[in-house]
Design a protein with these regions (language model features):
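N-terminal export and membrane-targeting signals
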Residues: 1-14
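Cell wall/extracellular polymer interaction/catalysis modules
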Residues: 2, 17-20, 25-210, 232, ...
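Preference for short coil/turn "hinge" residues that link or interrupt alpha-helices
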Residues: 14-17, 67, 215, 227
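Extracellularly exposed regions in secreted/surface proteins, prominently low-complexity, repeat-rich
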Residues: 206-252
């Protein structure tokens, strides 16, 4: 259980928030906008996601379609994994699946159609390349324009998440809810913290956030109901991580 002090952190520098927003969503255009309709337990999956029957959704020895190299990067203490299955190295379409580890193995808890960087994936992400970074990254901090929906992760509620007015209208609600992906950031800080330990050129501000119907600058976007489900499920005591990439890189 979070203390009152850790449950909500207020952003103090709006300018810093704009730097992070520019790194996350940019002026994405097109798409139908997030409709808030999440899918669970395999419904609504996009091509590229796991295609398995109900018998293969519980008591799994390993996270499906993730090879030994990335499995080795999942911390031993991690008992929650958000797997992002990209359709292809140059595709913006993906499927997000939440796995939770119990006494008998990994259980699939939910699945949502998603988007990643509009140019696909990369193992060497740089600012402005419009590709999402491949890898395994902790999930420690959350926030958004909207009030905390019942998150277990520390949640920063702030209007500083609001996209700039000059962005496309279909992106206006992208950051109603976000979970920071710990790529080139300092864990334990607000998602709005602009600090980039590897330098500005390596990009940053990579988040899970609401979907607007098309690719992002580097983030992974999920329907509103999916973001609400993730925020309520992800538990810092279970050391959640995201494992993300296209099919070839995930399996490699």
């Amino acid at each position: 259980m979070r203390t009152a002090g850790s449950a909500m952190r207020t952003a103090t520098v709006v300018a810093a928030g704009l730097v992070l927003l520019a790194g996350c969503g940019g002026g994405a255009s097109g798409g139908k906008g997030g409709d808030g309709k999440g899918d669970v337990a395999g419904k609504g999956e996009r091509p590229g996601g796991p295609a398995r029957g109900a018998s293969a959704t519980t008591h799994l020895k390993n996270i499906p379609e993730v090879g030994a190299a990335l499995r080795a990067r999942i911390p031993a203490g991690s008992r929650q994994v958000v797997a992002v299955y990209g359709k292809g190295v140059n595709s913006a379409e993906a499927t997000v699946v939440l796995y939770d580890k119990g006494a008998k193995g990994w259980d699939r808890k939910g699945s949502w159609a998603a988007h990643n960087g509009r140019r696909g994936w990369t193992v060497d992400h740089h600012e402005g390349d419009k590709r999402s970074p491949v890898g395994v990254f902790p999930l420690t901090d959350a926030g958004g324009v909207l009030q905390d929906p019942g998150a277990n992760l520390p949640y920063t509620h702030s209007s500083a998440f609001t996209p700039p007015s000059y962005w496309s209208k279909n992106t206006r609600h992208d950051f109603d809810y976000v979970v920071a992906i710990n790529y080139n950031r300092v864990k334990g800080t607000s998602p709005l913290d602009p600090t980039r330990p590897q330098g500005q050129s390596k990009g940053g501000g990579v988040w899970l956030h609401l979907d607007h119907g098309s690719g992002t600058s580097a983030c992974v976007s999920v329907p509103k109901a999916g973001m609400q489900a993730l925020l309520r499920a992800l538990d810092p005591a279970r050391h959640p991580v995201v494992v993300m990439g296209d099919a070839a890189h995930l399996a490699g």
